[in-house]
């Protein structure tokens, strides 16, 4: 088994969401077996709203990104989580 790089888009609840605090909260809930790859990047969406792009390295096993998706979705200030890309490395 190898590893998978997964890029996730995290949408905050509103333009008023504290993105600095949200980034820290996301880093604190990364599940065991997943590692943050690089920084959490802000991506402008529209009208001042910014998404957060998180790249994780996870094990290549069934359910790969699901624990991270579920953990991120439970963080206060997160509207939704979407997997943008996933590929073996």
Swiss-Prot record:
Entry similarity comment: Belongs to the EF-1-beta/EF-1-delta family.
Protein biosynthesis among keywords: yes
Name of the protein described by the UniProt record: Elongation factor 1-beta
Gene3D superfamilies in UniProt: 3.30.70.60
Gene designation per UniProt: ef1b
SMART domains named among the record's database cross-references: EF1_GNE (SM00888)
Lineage of the species this protein comes from: Archaea, Methanobacteriati, Methanobacteriota, Stenosarchaea group, Methanomicrobia
Any one Gene Ontology molecular-function term assigned to this protein's record: translation elongation factor activity
Alphabetized HAMAP family for the sequence: EF1_beta
InterPro entries: eEF-1beta-like_sf (IPR036219), EF1B_bsu/dsu_GNE (IPR014038), Transl_elong_EF1B/ribsomal_bS6 (IPR014717), Transl_elong_EF1B_B_arc (IPR004542)
CDD domains linked: EF1B
Keywords: Elongation factor, Protein biosynthesis
Function according to Swiss-Prot or TrEMBL: Promotes the exchange of GDP for GTP in EF-1-alpha/GDP, thus allowing the regeneration of EF-1-alpha/GTP that could then be used to form the ternary complex EF-1-alpha/GTP/AAtRNA.
Pfam families: EF1_GNE
């Amino acid at each position: 088994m190898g590893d998978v790089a997964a890029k996730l888009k995290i949408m905050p609840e509103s333009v008023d969401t504290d993105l600095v605090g949200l980034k820290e909260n996301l880093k604190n809930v990364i599940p065991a077996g997943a590692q943050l790859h690089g920084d959490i990047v802000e991506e402008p969406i529209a009208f001042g709203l910014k998404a957060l792009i998180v790249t994780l390295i996870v094990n290549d096993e069934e359910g790969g990104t699901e624990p991270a998706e579920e953990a991120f979705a439970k963080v206060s200030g997160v509207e939704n989580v979407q997997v943008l890309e996933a590929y073996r490395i």
